Amino acid sequence: MKTCLLWFRNNLRLSDNLPVYHAYQHYDQVIPVYLYPTQNAEHPTGNFPWGKHKQTFVAQSVAALGQLFEVHGCSLLVDENEGTIVERLCALAAMYEVDAIVGSTEPAYNEQMEELAIDQWAAERNVETHWFEERTLFEQHKLPFELADLPQSFTPFRKKLEKYSQPAAVLPEPTLTPSPVRSAPWTPTAHASLDQRSAHPFQGGVSAAWDRLDHYLWDTEHITTYKETRNGMLGADFSSKFSAFLALGCISAREIYAEIKRFEHQITSNESTYWLYFELLWREYFQWIARKHGRDLFLQGGLQPAKPKKNFRNKHFDMWKNGTTGDPLVDANMRELAATGFMSNRGRQNVASYLVHDLHLDWRYGAAWFEAMLIDHDPASNYGNWLYIAGVGNDPRPFRKFNTAFQAERYDPQGEYVNTWLD
């Protein structure tokens, strides 16, 4: 009998999941496992511990996946041991004497290095490794260009995909076989109470992801006004709020795309329904940017050579992250982040610009703080957007400074948002 270790990373679902599909189609025994991430000691800005809301959302999503396995008579092993991801995964593979390791490949540099190290360990022991792309709408071999020729800016990328490619089809959930290794259901310990002001009052997990999608598309049809409302900052429905579920893979981009197309076919299509797909394409672009550029995504100079260096002043950074800069819009957004683990896209652009262009700090500290605090943190999107604001990304216009007073006047003219978080 052939046995594989099925490693879950940021693909915490059973449906439309290539590693899951492959494992249960090709191996007699499957051991599903999730390894709680360790802090990255090589991070250029050091380590900020995860915020309590991120801890809670991740824990809820992992527990929800475990419950799905229990329904099928299986167990999800949740490993919280000390050591690196590579050490812990290889130790499990050795302990259970598996024939293969099956998992999702990640686009960011550190995760790519993990995969290479696991490949090396496995090759020395005649263990197969199989990696599948799970973050993207499109399969790499079906992109209308080689990765090395990825367009330098978003618009030509989007136009080529829309002209020459189609997102991959959604995969069915395979028939699961009972796990050869049984364990008691994992119970999360992280729990953060919900702030009633939160624009993201949702739990993590597959069921919560589909509940949100059904609400936003089918129950309320809010998708039909998405383009007009997406720059809001208060309330749950000004935007889709799919990002946290996408970041952890509680739902896939392909599943969301399929539901958008079904909605357009059965209900209506307009500029707003297209715009939600447009935003999925922005996310897609950052995934491939991360895979192409690797470690450069995390360097101060980003994708551009010889950019001037920024300083790091601890006092100014603390004012920024604590929401005490004296700029009402910036402070309100940073306090929302601390209280909920979420911030609107409009808010993220403003606080990022303020850190880089007003406080003149190294953008990587802001990106690292977002990484620690955001429940929807995705390395490719987070660091890609920070590079963009800092002027060291693919599209290197040097000065993307947001006038926060003008932004507040335009997007919060009555001061409702600022008053909500500063009162």
Where are these regions (language model features)?
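Trp/Phe/Arg-rich N-terminal binding region typifying the photolyase-homology
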Residues: 1-169, 335-336, 381, 385
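Intrinsically disordered, low-complexity boundary segments flanking structured domains
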Residues: 20-22, 62-65, 117-118, 139-143, ...
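Short amphipathic alpha-helical segments, especially helix-boundary/capping motifs
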Residues: 39-43, 63-66, 92-96, 187-190, ...
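Short coil/turn segments at secondary-structure junctions
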Residues: 45-49, 197, 317
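Hydrophobic residues within well-ordered, non-membrane alpha-helices that form the packing/core
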Residues: 69, 122, 158, 217, ...
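Glycine/tryptophan-enriched, flexible segments
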Residues: 127, 148-300, 408-423
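Active-site-proximal binding-pocket segments
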Residues: 235-422
